[in-house]
Design a protein with these regions (language model features):
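Acidic glycine-/aspartate-rich tracts in secreted/extracellular proteins
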Residues: 38-39, 103-105, 260-262, 313-314, ...
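Short aromatic-cysteine micro-motif
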Residues: 248-251, 282-444, 448, 454-519
């Protein structure tokens, strides 16, 4: 086990510290370095200007201010495999240095430590990186004024400091690499577990029972928690607290997600077989980087926690106070998008309109985006080691009755029920959402009603009467009964965070993944942060800059062009700079091969919508992308969800 003697400030480091104490400069940490140099007992290491035998250089992951204002704790992951370097020859780690920028001298060795007990860093074996997670205590003049270079980018301390709670969480657990891999050319949806995920059993539940899921006790899943979030982003309660509420009365129902490192990369083995890898961890090891769900803005501000919506968004009308020249204070009604159980999802709005409904909630509220979509995809693949979510979690709410002929009313009346063919009407379920209109998918007569009863007709042979709530409706023989969006909250009785409820049929049963209901199915979800122009996707990692039909500035061009034909996803493109981005470049798979979900594309497509709806069936799933609609598209099966950040 690697153990260190007390670290020392070098002579140059002391001089820089004196300048900082005199207010002439601040301490800017640039990098860390390991080496294999030998030191004799009592050797004066303070005079060193470099390590004796430097071997590897690493960025500083983040820093924490200790109880002493003049000390910071630097976090460094020493590994034999990073995005920029692969260690080909192993060595004994015997020396360690921290470098800083001196305004007169340039980069200097600021602090040095020698090992009392060395540790061997092996060469990378081509499968699993070795990592030593290190905390280095460093003397500075004022910890608040220290900046660090992280992965080559300068960031303010306020953006990169890890709160003590997170440090405690990570350091009490072994840094793990939970990973999977698949042969790129193999059509199977199954992946092979690697790293610390080997041997884990992960199952999804059906109904309200519990099942074995080993990964839920490992970071980051062990630290994900449903919560009630106020509009100022204060957590009012966590699931299990006496005050926690699913219905939104104590705040939006959100999933608190801790800062997580993810990776997606490709390697070819000695036999010439190309593999795709996915992995997650609490630390920056191997090919992993801080997932871009947690970064924001041109300076890559870091959010220690992100809050993802558990339910499709529903609209709440609230009273807001405002001030004008004529009236000092007045009340104004505004609409906001809420994540809560027991409501019909909002729909028939454009992506831009959903964006406004989210931003109206306050600072750091946004429309849920492509970064959350990609992050959850990786979490699913790592947890269940496959890309067939419908086969694992269930079909989702994707197979509801929709028929413009069988759904025609067989009797005219004004009331709260419609008479339809028995074989069609009996496919509906009590409590499900329906609409009635002059034709299939028309809501001209009744929108988003709930079925209250289904019984045989006493007046029409081979027919049933489907009763619904709300005001009476004038039914004619041109009226059509069909399944529209479904109310939220179907999964709140489940004990397991992953799986499906026991509905009338599997295809009418809501699924949840990490407590997130209707992750696919029920209603398509707009995903902000990605604008499309003639199959070229432009991404944005600055949420304040999200806008429709923008292709420059904060939006950057993804390093490949999307596929031009629709079909089941066979291949996602790969941009090494933004490795988590998954855009279909090749179809030709099926509902049970490769990625198992359907991709829609058209030359005029401008926005991204994910998941599927009540009528999309086997093509639905987390990897299904609807990229064929304009920014002005709005329809009954397009919805959105609010996302929040610390």
């Amino acid at each position: 086990m690697l153990m260190w003697n007390p670290s020392k400030l070098t002579t140059a480091g002391k001089a820089l510290l004196a300048k900082a104490q005199a207010g002439q400069t601040s301490i800017q940490i640039t990098k860390a370095q390991t080496g294999s140099g030998s030191y004799s007992s009592g050797e004066n290491i303070e005079s060193r200007t470099a390590l004796k035998t430097p071997k590897q250089t690493f960025p500083i992951q983040n820093k924490v201010i200790s109880d002493a204002d003049s000390t910071v704790i630097l976090k460094i992951a020493i590994t034999n495999k990073s995005e920029s370097e692969t260690l080909s020859t192993g060595y004994d780690i015997t020396e360690f240095g921290i470098f800083a920028q001196d305004p007169q001298k340039g980069e200097i060795l600021y602090s040095i430590a020698t090992a009392s007990t060395s540790d061997y860093m092996p060469a990378y074996n081509g499968v699993l990186p070795s990592v030593i997670n290190m905390s280095y205590y460093l003397e500075v003049s004022n910890a608040e004024n220290v900046t660090i270079n992280s992965a080559g980018a300068l960031a303010l301390q306020a953006d990169l400091e890890a709160l003590e709670a997170r440090v405690t969480t990570i350091e009490k657990n072994k840094v793990e690499l939970l990973g999977v891999r698949r042969k790129v050319d193999a059509s199977s949806y199954a992946w092979e577990r690697i790293g610390d995920a080997v041997g884990m059993v992960c199952k999804a539940a059906v109904g309200n029972g519990t099942v074995q899921n080993d990964m839920m006790s490992h970071y980051p899943f062990s630290e994900m928690r449903p919560c009630n979030l106020a509009e100022d982003r204060t957590v009012n309660a966590y699931l299990g607290d006496a005050t926690f509420q699913w219905d939104g009365t104590n705040g939006d129902v959100m999933l608190e997600v801790p800062m997580t490192y993810t990776g997606r990369w490709f390697e070819t083995d000695a036999d010439g077989v190309k593999w795709e890898y996915r992995a997650i961890s609490s630390a920056q090891i191997g090919h992993l980087h801080l997932d871009h769900l947690f970064t924001d803005g041109a300076d890559r501000r870091i959010s220690e926690k992100v809050y993802l919506p558990i339910f499709p968004g529903s609209i709440e009308h609230i009273e807001s106070s405002t001030q004008s020249e004529e009236v000092s204070v007045r009340s104004v009604a505004v609409d906001v998008l809420r994540s809560r159980a027991g409501y019909m999802p909002a729909h028939n709005k454009t992506c831009g309109q959903f964006r406004i409904l989210c931003k109206t909630k306050g600072d750091n509220w946004y429309l849920d985006d492509v970064w959350a979509m990609h992050f959850l995809d990786t979490c699913y693949i790592v947890m269940f080691a496959n890309t067939h979510a419908q086969g694992t979690l269930g079909p989702g709410r994707t197979e509801f009755p929709e028929d413009g002929t069988k759904g025609l009313a067989l009797q005219e009346r004004t009331g709260n029920y419609i008479t339809v063919a028995k074989d069609y009407g009996n496919r509906f379920a009590i409590g499900q959402g329906i609409s009635i209109g002059n034709g299939l998918w028309s809501q001209s007569l009744a929108a988003d009603r709930l079925v209250t009863k289904i019984e045989d007709s006493t007046e029409v042979e081979n027919a049933v009467c489907v009763y619904f709530d709300g005001d009476p409706v004038a039914i004619t023989t041109t009226s059509v009964l069909w399944s529209s969006v479904q109310p939220t909250g179907a999964t709140i009785g489940m004990a397991s965070p992953n799986g499906r409820v026991e509905g009338k049929t599997p295809g009418m049963s809501a699924i949840r993944f990490l407590w997130i209901e209707d992750w696919y199915g029920n209603i398509w979800q707009f995903r902000d942060g990605d604008n499309i122009q003639k199959y070229q996707h432009y991404y944005c990692n600055d949420r304040s800059a999200y806008a429709d039909k923008v292709y420059n500035g904060s939006y950057f061009k993804v390093g490949y062009v999307a596929g031009t034909a629709e079909g089941y996803v066979k291949t996602f493109g790969y941009d090494p700079e933004w490795s988590e981005i998954e855009i279909c470049t090749e179809n030709g798979a099926s509902s049970n091969t490769y990625f198992c979900d359907y991709y829609y594309a058209a030359e005029g497509g401008e926005v991204v919508i994910s998941g599927g709806s009540v009528l999309r069936g086997a093509g639905s799933g987390p990897f299904s992308r609807h990229c064929s609609n304009s920014a002005g598209a709005s329809i009954w099966y397009f919805g959105g969800r609010p996302q929040a950040r610390k």
